[in-house]
Each structure stands twice: as structure tokens, then as C-alpha cells.
């Protein structure tokens, strides 16, 4: 297992270098990284500035090796978090046109559309986004269970709330403000999960080395 974990970390490093060290992409990658940290701190205005800069530098840049999210995805989410719903909708639609597998862009698009008043269309995207996130986590934890997959959502802190919200949607007649709040929390936790998983993996490797 130790060899597999070490190999995974090396692969992540090589891929990160590959995707971020090509011309303008290097600057875009730095802006996205700083924007993510600002977003995690709750500094949505600061995050928006970083993601705008990243999109202007390289609108096709892809961040990360697991979730693989584009600069437009991050920009659209920051616009949503800053209450800029019309620009967010346009940006998130472009992000999904680039990468249909961007589950967070899909979830945030649903939230945006719902908050604009089209709850039926918004709900469809919210539900679809949640299901895709759950399926992705299940894939990671089962396919790679003996290596890095064990560090992804180990206590199902993301998947359990997803199931709860999907059940609520299926029953109908739910509180929209609660669904939106829950969805935003799920989205933020999922965005942070690669960082959390990598940190847990590194801690486990350090423990194994010290034995």
C-alpha cells in the first residue's frame, strides 16, 4: 500500500506540473490556487478577483487532477457567491460546454437558475449535480479502495448529506432555502475534498515511515 500511495503522490505531482507549467497556464494556476483559498476563508470578493484574473489569462486552464475544474467553473461559482446571478449563469453554462463532467459547475448552475426563479429547471440540475458527485465519490472509494481512495470522504460526510437532500427532493414540498443552503455546503465540502484526502494520505505515509 505504501508503494501505491507514494506512486499516486508522484503521479499527482507530475500531472500538476504538466498542467500548470505551460506559458500563461502557470499564472492561471497560481490565481486559481489563491482564489480557492480565499473562497474557503469566505472571502468571496477576493476569490472573484483571482478567478477573473485566471480566466482572463487562460480561460481553458484546468485545475487539479481529480475533479479537473476549469477557470470558468471557478469564476461562475464566485459570481454566484457574490450574488451576480446573471453573469454566473452565463459563465457556468460555458464551463459545462467545455467540460460536461464538471459536477460542481452543474450543481452551482442549478442553484443559480433556481435563485433566478426557474425552480423546476434549477432543481433538475441540482439533483443531477448531487447524484454525479455521489457517484464520483463512490467510484473513488471503491475502485481505489486499497490505495488513495480510502482517503476520500471516509466518513461519508459528503455522501450522507447528499442522500438526505435527494430524499427530501423526492418527497417534494420541501423548504427551498434549506435545500439551497445544504447544496452550497455540500459543494464547498466537495471542492475541499481533494485537499483533505491528500493531507490524510500524506499523514498516513508519514506514520508508515515512522514505524
Residue ranges of model-derived segments:
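Bacterial Sec signal peptide processing site at the extreme N-terminus
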Residues: 19-38
Amino acid at each position: 500500500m505504501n508503494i501505491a500511495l507514494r506512486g499516486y503522490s508522484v503521479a499527482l505531482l507530475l500531472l500538476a506540473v504538466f498542467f500548470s507549467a505551460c506559458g500563461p497556464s502557470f499564472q492561471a494556476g497560481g490565481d486559481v490556487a489563491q482564489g480557492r483559498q480565499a473562497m474557503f476563508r469566505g472571502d468571496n470578493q477576493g476569490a472573484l478577483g483571482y478567478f477573473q484574473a485566471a480566466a482572463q489569462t487562460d480561460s481553458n486552464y484546468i485545475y487539479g487532477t481529480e475533479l479537473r475544474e476549469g477557470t470558468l467553473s471557478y469564476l461562475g461559482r464566485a459570481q454566484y457567491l457574490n450574488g451576480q446571478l446573471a453573469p454566473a449563469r452565463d459563465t457556468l453554462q460555458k464551463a459545462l460546454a467545455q467540460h460536461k463532467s464538471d459536477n460542481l459547475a452543474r450543481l452551482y448552475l442549478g442553484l443559480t437558475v433556481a435563485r433566478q426563479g426557474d425552480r423546476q429547471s434549477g432543481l433538475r440540475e441540482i439533483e443531477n449535480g448531487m447524484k454525479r458527485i455521489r457517484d464520483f465519490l463512490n467510484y473513488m472509494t471503491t475502485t481505489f479502495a486499497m490505495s488513495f481512495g480510502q482517503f476520500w470522504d471516509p466518513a461519508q460526510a459528503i455522501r450522507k448529506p447528499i442522500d438526505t437532500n435527494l430524499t427530501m427532493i423526492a418527497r417534494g414540498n420541501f423548504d427551498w432555502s434549506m435545500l439551497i443552503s445544504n447544496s452550497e455546503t455540500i459543494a464547498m465540502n466537495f471542492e475541499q475534498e481533494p485537499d483533505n484526502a491528500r493531507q490524510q494520505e500524506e499523514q498516513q505515509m508519514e506514520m508508515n515511515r515512522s514505524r
